[in-house]
């Protein structure tokens, strides 16, 4: 038989569905299909292409061959990966507790350690009475209990037990820095406070803080050098120790130019026993401690070598200078700053280098037993919002030396705070109609000068009993045997220890004509409290004198060289 030949399609209407020249069936016109229509039709076709034998030639969405799902018969799949006996585990647990008692030590390769076996679980507060004494032993025929178990045998023992419990509760949930070494309470507290004295305690602000903590690898707590213990957040430190042990904390003594050099060095020695502490003066042009802080952050980046970049969060009280520190590190104004609290509203990311990012956080205040006057003098409340600013002036006169107030306001003598305000208003011309002194404006002037550092004031450091050796300054928490290794992490720890020790020997800048010679050179009581840790080979007067401007300029020049590469690497200096 002869096969019939197919007629050639000579009508000019191609029938293939993927032919771009085919006419659209919906329309009765002779228009051809567009390219987008042909691509859409090709997208609908997902069936595999097969040859005459049924073998798949090409398929876009399915694999051509099934992988071999058979598991190799290896005992490593079913055996123990790591085995340790109880003696080694107990020895390692003791060593871990010893090393981690210091905030200067770091756990390397924490993910490879059985932390659930090394950390002891907290004791359960609930008493399992049924496990200790079941019902059968307490009631029924098989009763074994002869007399009930009581907490105390008589009323005196019960009162003693209650007093011990109360003391333990107050010690655990105390006010923190305000209650330590301060005045004893009179048993009264403010039942109702104005909402302005609760600034920095809102749920939104605490949410911003915890976002910064969760996002940060290193947390820098900025504190005021004039009152370091008063501006510390012990609640935050306790939270980090309990729930964020893998995060590192640094204490930064900002505004060190407002206190004498001997006071700054004394606080460095005191606070360094708890956390790595650095002195800092925030200034874009003339800064102090910028090179040391950058070096410490670089060493922490070396410790976190498994991460592509690390984040450094700056937290602390309002108006302590967190945003100013970030601007100093970047050598440009990338964060909004103001001499009033509450300028930073939300957290923001700042790029320092390719491996280091900075996070600015709003100021957070932990609720404590501070009075309204303490809250105002810590810089938490804006002075312009105070209804009666004159009631806080008495505490300012008690804290500041009389000669400093005489030099600042040109007032020779006064009887009380009201008399001081009267003389200040008359001398400065703050008068109302009829020549009456404007006490409110005068009080706000004093509080503005207090918050902006124009009135000399500082809390002296406590006395230390430990005396350092002549050859070197001891940095607490650093084990020389542990850092003797030449590995990268050990070198980073050794570098951090060196930075801490060298800054304790540096001269700290102090504003000229701010303190008199007696305050700069220190009286005998302050010398006894701080010179016990000073080196025997150095002269006390040279250590305690204010540094010259040349020393500050040289430090700032070195800091500019240290971050010169950052400006070239990071073109985008705005916050994300």
Curated annotation (Swiss-Prot):
Q: List the biased-composition ranges (Basic and acidic residues).
A: 16-34, 509-530
* Main subcellular location: nucleus
Q: Gene Ontology terms, cellular component aspect?
A: nucleolus
Region of interest (G3), ranges: 360-363
What tissues has this protein been observed in?
Ubiquitous, with higher levels in meristematic regions.
GO MF, any single term: GTP binding
**Annotated spans, Disordered:** 1-61, 166-186, 502-576
User: SUPFAM superfamilies given for it?
Assistant: P-loop containing nucleoside triphosphate hydrolases (SSF52540)
Name its GO BP terms in alphabetical order: ribosome biogenesis
Compositionally biased residues, Acidic residues:
531-576
The record's section on Pfam families has: MMR_HSR1, NGP1NT
Its activity is regulated as follows:
The GTPase activity is stimulated in the presence of the 60S ribosomal subunit.
Which region ranges are annotated with the description G5? 283-285
Q: What is this protein's name?
A: Nuclear/nucleolar GTPase 2
Print the keywords alphabetically.
Answer: GTP-binding, Hydrolase, Nucleotide-binding, Nucleus
State the protein's purpose: GTPase involved in pre-60S ribosomal subunit maturation.
**Stretches with biased composition (Basic residues):** 42-52
């Amino acid at each position: 038989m002869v096969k019939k030949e197919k007629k050639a399609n000579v009508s000019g209407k191609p029938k293939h569905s993927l032919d771009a020249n085919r006419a659209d069936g919906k329309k009765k016109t002779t228009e051809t299909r567009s390219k987008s229509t042909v691509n859409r039709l090709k997208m609908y076709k997902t069936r595999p292409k097969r040859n005459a034998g049924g073998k798949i030639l090409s398929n876009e969405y399915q694999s051509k061959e099934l992988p071999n799902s058979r598991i190799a018969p290896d005992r490593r799949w079913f055996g123990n990966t790591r085995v340790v006996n109880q003696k080694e585990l107990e020895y390692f647990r003791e060593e871990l507790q010893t090393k981690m008692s210091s905030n200067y030590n770091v756990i390397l390769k924490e993910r490879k350690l059985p932390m659930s076996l090394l950390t002891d679980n907290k004791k359960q507060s609930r008493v399992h009475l049924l496990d200790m004494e079941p019902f059968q032993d307490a009631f029924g025929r098989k009763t074994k209990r002869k007399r009930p178990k009581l907490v105390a045998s008589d009323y005196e023992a019960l009162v003693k037990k209650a007093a011990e419990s109360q003391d333990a509760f107050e010690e655990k949930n105390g006010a923190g820095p305000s209650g330590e070494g301060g005045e004893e309470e009179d048993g009264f507290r403010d039942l109702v406070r104005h909402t302005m004295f609760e600034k920095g305690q809102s749920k939104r602000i605490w949410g911003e803080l915890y976002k910064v903590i969760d996002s940060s690898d290193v947390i820098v707590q900025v504190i005021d050098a004039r009152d370091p213990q008063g501006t510390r957040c012990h609640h935050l430190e306790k939270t980090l120790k309990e729930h964020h042990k893998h995060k590192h904390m640094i204490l930064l003594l900002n505004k060190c130019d407002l206190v004498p050099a001997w006071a700054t060095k004394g606080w460095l020695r005191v606070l360094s026993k708890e956390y790595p502490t650095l002195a800092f003066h925030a200034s874009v042009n003339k800064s102090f401690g910028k090179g040391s802080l950058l070096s410490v952050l670089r060493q922490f980046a070396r410790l976190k070598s498994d991460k592509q970049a690390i984040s450094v969060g700056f937290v602390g009280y309002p108006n302590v200078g967190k945003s100013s520190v970030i601007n100093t590190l970047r050598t440009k104004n990338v964060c909004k700053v103001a001499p009033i609290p509450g300028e930073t509203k939300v957290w923001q990311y700042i790029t320092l280098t390719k491996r280091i990012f900075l996070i600015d956080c709003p100021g957070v205040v932990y609720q404590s037993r501070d009075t309204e006057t303490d809250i105002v003098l810590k810089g938490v409340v804006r002075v312009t919002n105070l209804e009666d600013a004159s009631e806080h002036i008495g505490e300012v006169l008690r804290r500041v030396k009389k000669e400093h107030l005489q030099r600042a306001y040109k007032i020779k003598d006064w009887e009380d705070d009201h008399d001081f305000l009267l003389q200040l208003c008359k001398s400065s011309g703050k008068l109302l109609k009829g020549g009456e002194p404007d006490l409110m404006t005068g009080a706000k002037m004093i509080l503005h000068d207090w918050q902006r550092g124009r009135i000399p004031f500082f809390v002296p450091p406590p006395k230390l009993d430990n005396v350092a050796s002549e050859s070197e300054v001891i940095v607490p928490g650093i084990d020389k045997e542990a850092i003797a290794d030449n590995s990268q992490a050990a070198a980073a720890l050794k570098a951090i220890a060196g930075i801490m020790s060298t800054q304790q020997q540096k001269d700290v800048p102090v504003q000229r004509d701010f303190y008199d010679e007696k305050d700069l050179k220190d009286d005998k009581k302050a010398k006894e409290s701080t010179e016990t840790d000073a080196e025997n080979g150095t002269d006390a007067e040279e250590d305690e004198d204010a540094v010259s401007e040349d020393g500050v300029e040289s430090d700032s020049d070195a800091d500019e060289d240290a971050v010169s590469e950052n400006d070239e690497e990071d073109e985008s200096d705005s916050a994300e």
